[in-house]
Amino acid sequence: MASMARAAGGRPKTAATGEPAPVDSLVSDYLTSCRARGLSVRTLDNAYGFALERVFLPWCRREGIRTTTELSQLVLDRFTTDLLSRQSERGRPLSKASVHTYVRPVRQMLHWAEGIGEPVTGRPQLPKQPRREKEVLSRHEIDRLEDAARTERDKVIIRLFADCGLRLSELTGISAGDIRRTANRSYLRVHGKGDRERLVPVLPDLARRLDRLGRAQGGDRAGDRLFTSSRRGSGGEHEPLTESGVAQMVSAVAREAQLGKAVHPHLLRHSWMTEMLRKGMNPIQLAAIAGASEKVIAEHYAHLSQDDAYEAVARALLGSR
């Protein structure tokens, strides 16, 4: 396979010999490079693999495009245009946000390809999206969610999403040994995207509740995961909660709380990040705690309202007077 052939310096043979690379080999090489950079298999599949292997490559085959030299700006613009006119599984046009998720990995791949010597002459354009405020949950709504949860386990899960900004996959991976203490402060060791580890601050009350939850379960669970199912597995032990199980619980609790909103774990994380910014947390510090890049913070949290902007300026200019 062309994707397995390498020249000196890790470049595809096609680039080293001056011949344009086949598009399918280029995709394979790029995904290999992403994995070598430390991206997790999950991130690779969800953020890059689907867009490149299931959307971009089939489109190239339908259009008869075989090599990078055929990916002119006009051709790449046609790729974006075709996506904008494509229908989703529900029979509706793809949203501009969905088109972004498919186009961005192609742009990143072509940028990488240019860096290794491929004859890249264009980039697919990202359709302009209307900027609007994203929905968030208020502290009152989060309190209602916790009140509606039926078990202490579920209440603690709600709080970890809302007060620590954890991702769904991060929460289900927590073990009892991930609770760390230094002097009078508590932290949660979290394994985030790309298997990167970070410490997330946990306020005293929530830390105590985590301790009690761990002690209550004791050794009556399969493995070392902190959050387990109330049902026992075939071995008589409580099995770890799955991501789908947690997501279903959050949705069910939201219906019980009658919030009138579609609530999911990421909305709780998003609400936490928005609140931290509104209360003046440094975006660089927030990115480190949340396990997100500063670029993501800038792109996805530019939705703060005019009132938020006014308050930020007032704090900066009037706070010390």
Regions found by a protein language model. Give the residues of each.
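Basic, Lys/Arg- and aromatic-enriched nucleic-acid-binding interface segment
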Residues: 139-168, 194-196
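C-terminal secondary-structure termini that scaffold catalytic or DNA-interacting sites
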Residues: 1-17, 315-321
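Conserved tyrosine-mediated DNA breakage-rejoining catalytic core shared by Y-recombinases
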Residues: 169, 173-209, 296
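Catalytic-site neighborhood detector that most strongly recognizes the C-terminal catalytic loop/helix
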Residues: 136, 194, 290-315
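DNA breakage-rejoining catalytic core of tyrosine-based enzymes
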Residues: 116-119, 129-147, 195-205, 218-226, ...
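Short, basic (Lys/Arg/His-rich) helix/loop patches that form interaction surfaces
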Residues: 200, 220-222, 247-288, 292-295, ...
